[in-house]
Structures are given as structure tokens and as C-alpha cells.
Amino acid sequence: MNIFALDRDPYVAASFHCDKHVVKMICEYAQLLSTAHRQLDGTPVILEWENIEDNGNTKIAKRKTLHPLPGETPYVEFETVTVRDDEGHLRDEVTGTASLLGRLCYNSTHHNHPCAIWARQTDANYHWLVQLFDGVLREYEKRYQKKHATEKLREFFLIAPKNIDKGVLTPFALAMPDEYKVDDEVLSYQNYYVGDKARFAKWTEPATVPKWFSNRVQDDESNFQRPSRVRG
């Protein structure tokens, strides 16, 4: 979970996303925006049910908390499947999954993550992330000549959560190892890209490699020290 604030302009930051992140971060940004809606406007509902295994001989208690928004109805969807046990015998299992009828967006996830907290801290933060999400969707379409399925949530996200605080853009959350952090959040994320993402970072045309990235990766005399172990 992260928000790659590679520039203070969210659309420029989106253009700086490498191909892997253009594909991956669309869903992550949608999850963060969805979590903002559910944590601020949703009503916590606890669903409890039993999964049934071993032809009815074993019952496993399950519990899930959802945050339905107005217009959504929580329910448990059950599915019966036939499986083969270790001895080769067939048996039925009944598995329940907590879901929402009339779902408007993704479920709440990682709500205590620094980026999730930042996204719902002020309406300015929320709308900045909406623009980053929109920018990455545009990058995806530009680079791969097709639309991402998550684009269906674009219109929903245009309206901020009803209960979000009004306020200015706050400093970006820095979800990265301390070795990349400096006083400037954007430079911190650029450090993170150069030091941790260079091994897989590429940009499919018509996108271009950011100059700050290519210059620093190619400059052997850079003051920035890359870590000895590259993190995935």
C-alpha cells in the first residue's frame, strides 16, 4: 500500500509511474479511496456465519466486519463445493463469503496504514488522490490502448466522503524505508524510485523515462547511495 507522490502535480506524478505501477497502483488507489468512504461514511456491521466441512461434521465459525454505505445491503453468500480429501474421498464443503448487495466501491482495507489515514485526513488530500487515480487510469489507456476495469469507479470517487474534514493538502505520508527519507516528500519518493525500483522500472511509449530518474540512475557520482539489497 502506497501513494507514489513523484511530483506535487498529481497528473505529472501519474506520468512518472513506471509500467508496473501503472498496472498495480490503479487498484491500490481505488482501495485507498474506497476505504476513505467506508471509514468516514460507512456503518460498521458484523456478519457471523459457519463454514461447514467434512460432510457436515465440522463447523468453523467465521466473522467479518463490513462498512456498508447508504444503499448497500450486507449479506453472506454461500457456495457448496465438492472436494477430495487426503484419502481420496469426496466430500462437500459449504463456504460463506461476506458481501454487499448494491456495492458502490471496494471494501475497506488497511485502514490504519499511513497512506489510508492521509487519504481521508482532509478533502484536499482526498481530491489529490482522486486526480492521481484519474491520471494513472489515463496513463494505462495511453500505454496499453485499453481501459482498466476499475475505471467504473471514477465517477463515484469524484464526490468526497460526506464526513471528511475540510482542509488543505497535508504532507504526504512516506511509506518507505528511512534511508530514502529527506525533508522534501517528493524527493523522498524519487529517492525510493531510484534506489528501490530501478531494477524493474520501465516506461512504455508514448510515456518517457522521467529525467530525474534517468539522470540519477546513470550518474555514478551521485551523492545518493543505493542500498545493497534491492527490495521488491
Protein language model features and the residues they cover:
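Sequence termini and other peripheral, non-core segments
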Residues: 1-43, 47-112, 116-232
